[in-house]
């Protein structure tokens, strides 16, 4: 099969960060007194969204007068600290797949809700940024 172009997502596809987001979301939810079963539903609703769409989704599920942006900032701070200490893992086979696609002259894109600085940092850390022809980030799309 000949591929002309392939577009990837970042979290949970290129990098193994989705599980880290979930871990830190649940931790922060517990700290705020949100039951785990409610947080699991909230996490499912906000996965892959932007901070703007996620505010409404989070507040619809959680309610309780909890400020989503403060919650998000605490989660992102925990995520950043973890990645600073331990790095971020690629999902298995990612580098080989990207190399294969480029060898076949396929265009490769990334479309992610992750912000530019974080996403490009992940790509550069694993030296896979060179495989991407087009990049779209959560903070570069107008709402």
What are these regions (language model features)?
Residues 3-95, 100, 104, 117:
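N-terminal helical cap/lid subdomain that shapes the substrate entry/recognition surface
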Residues 88-89, 109, 115-143:
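Substrate-recognition "cap/lid" segment bordering the active-site pocket of phosphatases
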Residues 14, 109-110:
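Short catalytic-loop micro-motif centered on adjacent basic/acidic residues
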């Amino acid at each position: 099969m000949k591929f002309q172009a392939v577009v990837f997502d970042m979290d949970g596809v290129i990098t193994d960060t989705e599980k880290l987001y979930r871990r830190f979301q649940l931790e922060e939810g517990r700290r705020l007194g949100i039951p785990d079963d409610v947080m699991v539903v909230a996490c499912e609703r906000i996965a892959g969204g932007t901070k703007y769409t996620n505010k409404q989704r989070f507040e619809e599920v959680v309610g309780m007068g909890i400020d989503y942006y403060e919650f998000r900032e605490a989660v992102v701070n925990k995520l950043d600290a973890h990645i600073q200490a331990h790095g971020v893992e690629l999902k298995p086979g990612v580098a080989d797949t990207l190399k294969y696609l480029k060898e076949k002259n396929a265009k490769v894109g990334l479309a992610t809700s992750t912000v530019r600085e974080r996403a490009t940092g992940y790509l550069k850390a694993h030296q896979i940024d060179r495989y991407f022809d087009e990049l779209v980030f959560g903070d570069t799309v107008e709402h």
